[in-house]
Amino acid sequence: MRAPVSFDPFRRYWRIYGGWKALLTSPYFHLAVILTAVCYPLWSKAGTESADLAISVIPSVMAFSLGGMAIVLAFSGGRFLTVIRQGGDDASLFMTVIANFFHFLVIQTLALISALVALSFPKLLVPSGVAFFFLAYSVTAAIASAASLFNVSRIYNVVGDDENQS
């Protein structure tokens, strides 16, 4: 049985991103696990401090993500787009960068949702730990997204864009 059409973008993103293997071998994921363990004293206290932190930080990080995606899409024209589309392949650099930003937004959304759950249950340790992990993963994944933008900009620097050259 096939998943509903509304899940198709998620299926495609997950495949292009690399699935569970890419997630579980990601150094950014590992760093988030380490940060969550090291910061145990911060998120394990009864109360809502770590959830409040996530709710105050994540919207700004989401804006960075959407801005980064907008930059990639804005520069996606002419010769540059032809080069990074790699013949329309699903695994092209263009689709990989977009999938990375999509992943970044999924992580941030999970961070926000888990922070709201942690706020609802301030005396429970697990929701607070999960919320902190997704916050940490959002922050570490910001580095990965910035690296994707940097790589795309290096290609743009070499290839340029016929439409912008007179």
Protein language model regions, located:
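N-terminal juxtamembrane cytosolic/stromal segments of multi-pass membrane proteins
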Residues: 1-34
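Alpha-helical transmembrane segments and their membrane-interface junctions
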Residues: 37-40, 105-128
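Alpha-helical transmembrane segments and their immediate juxtamembrane interface regions
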Residues: 72, 130-163
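Select subsegments of transmembrane alpha-helices in polytopic membrane proteins
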Residues: 24-31, 96-108
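Membrane-water interface of transmembrane alpha-helices
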Residues: 68-82
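Short membrane-interface loop/juxtamembrane segments of multi-pass integral membrane proteins
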Residues: 81-100
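Alpha-helical transmembrane segments of integral membrane proteins
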Residues: 59, 98, 102, 127-141
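Alpha-helical transmembrane segments
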Residues: 50-66, 135
